[in-house]
């Protein structure tokens, strides 16, 4: 339980950290400006463009970042509509293109992408549902990246990070194969997956039974670490991102990772009463640290 610090605390932020923090400020400023737009669809599209523009600027050029993409498999099945897709244009042809609409092969997809203005319970349900449908498609083994593709999401805000992570962890326990690989909450945290080698938590990308839902408590450096993870996906087999990491030793050396213990997750997923009691502890403690809320929740369901 509680937080696992990967290394000792770093000192002053690097130039790279400062640059990415400025990108994050720009994103939040654009988000606040778009709040003045009354038309909901236009407002949502504006916020999608903002984050996709940043990704297009910063990710390796092997990856195309595009909206309006239809993903199909070899059986002619189509994926649900995602806000955007990260896919490989260096090796894979398009199947169809007409103005802003593009049809691509499932095997060319690195990750399907969802954008949320504010991350709540219904948003998480939507992300998991779309991930399940994407992962049920027939993916041939000759893809450029992961088989099946990954799912990631970006949220500008989250009113209760503790509750959101609790919901993420519970759904991940209940539907392991439908779990998104990474959710970014700007300037707050990253929700991801890990496995244990007995003494250490190791980050994993592809969801599977037995994975451990984790929260990287990244705060103002969330965007930097998100770009790092996406770049690592895009450069599989390369040591490029190891070098990228060294440009910000201070942030990576101070990463704290939180996860729930297995007895807690087993209890809340096997008992509706325990689930309700535990969830109330996170719902009513948005201002507390997740460690404190977790300690209260364990007590409420009799785990001490």
Model-derived segments and spans:
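Intrinsically disordered, low-complexity Ser/Thr/Pro/Gly-rich regulatory segments
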Residues: 2-81, 86-304
């Amino acid at each position: 339980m509680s937080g696992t610090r990967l290394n000792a605390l770093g000192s002053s932020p690097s130039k790279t950290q400062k640059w990415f923090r400025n990108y994050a400020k720009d994103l939040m400023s654009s988000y606040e400006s778009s709040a003045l737009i009354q038309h909901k669809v236009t407002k949502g599209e504006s916020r999608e463009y903002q984050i996709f523009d940043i990704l297009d600027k910063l990710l390796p050029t092997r990856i195309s970042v595009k909206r309006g993409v239809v993903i199909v498999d070899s059986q002619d099945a189509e994926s649900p509509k995602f806000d955007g897709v990260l896919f490989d244009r260096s090796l894979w042809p398009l199947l169809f293109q007409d103005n802003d609409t593009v049809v691509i092969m499932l095997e060319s997809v690195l990750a399907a992408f969802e954008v949320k203005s504010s991350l709540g319970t219904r948003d998480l349900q939507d992300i998991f549902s779309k991930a399940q449908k994407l992962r049920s498609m027939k993916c041939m083994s000759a893809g450029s990246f992961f088989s099946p593709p990954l799912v990631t999401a970006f949220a500008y805000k989250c009113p209760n990070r503790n509750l959101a992570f609790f919901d993420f962890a519970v759904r991940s326990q209940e539907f392991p194969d439908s779990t998104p690989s990474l959710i970014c909450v700007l300037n707050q945290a990253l929700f991801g997956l890990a496995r244990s080698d007995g003494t250490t938590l190791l980050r994993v990308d592809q969801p599977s039974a037995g994975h451990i839902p984790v929260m990287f408590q990244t705060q103002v450096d969330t965007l930097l670490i998100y770009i790092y993870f996406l770049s690592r996906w895009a450069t599989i087999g390369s040591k490029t991102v190891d070098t990228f990491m060294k440009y910000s030793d201070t942030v990576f050396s101070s990463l704290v990772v939180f996860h729930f213990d297995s007895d807690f997750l087993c209890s809340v997923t096997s008992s509706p009463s325990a689930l309700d009691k535990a969830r109330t502890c996170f719902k009513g403690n948005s201002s507390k640290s997740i460690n404190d809320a977790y300690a209260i929740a364990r007590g409420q369901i009799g785990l001490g």
